[in-house]
Amino acid sequence: MTQTLENLSNQTAQLNMPRDIARFNMIEQQIRTWDVLDPTVLQLLNDVPRERFVPAEYQGLAFADIEIPLGQDSNGQLQSMLSPKLEGRILQALNVQKHQYILHVGTGSGYFTALLASLAKHVTSIEIDADLSAQAAKNLAKVNINNVTLIVADGILGQPSDNANVLFDVIVYTGSSPREPAGVREQLVIGGLLLMVLGNAPAMQASLIQRVSETGFREDVLFETCLPALMNAPQIKRFEF
């Protein structure tokens, strides 16, 4: 059975007081102050134990306003968790519902996958690095979240080609891309949402794209941020004179 928010809350209540204080301060001083006010999101970030997904050497920073390192992937690129405030802002924008099916690209530690899975019907989460995906599976098992399918693949173009006919209510990338990969928005159901961080450092923007009809889409820029680029992300073509 999928772990419920109530069960997770009971689980985290057993943590020692200093950790609980750090978690409270994370929510009140980092997340709320970044205009994340949705009570469901705030409760979720309190209930899903972030520290269970943080590497042992960074446990003291589990609730800090930083992108916690996860080590290097097979190509030597540094991987990291999203900062807590960015996790909250993205969740608030997506407004995930319990009947929804989600595609998540960039599993990482599995924590953001866990947040999504605690709200949704099912999450398909893609990670290009096999070691990270394996660790994410262990982390998710620690908190009894099992409505997740983990896939080791290059997810820059969305779902694997052998699932090309599957559409999602929500698609979210937790890494950046200089430009939107072709064909990803077409993997949404009508009414579905795609959230990506687009651009090159230091000028990146979180964009929310909604499919409003079979061929129509609406795009809104939510906020400015900066994230490491996903491997094999499409580059902006530059004109040569």
PLM segments and residue spans:
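Class I SAM-dependent transferase core
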Residues: 2-103, 111, 115, 119, ...
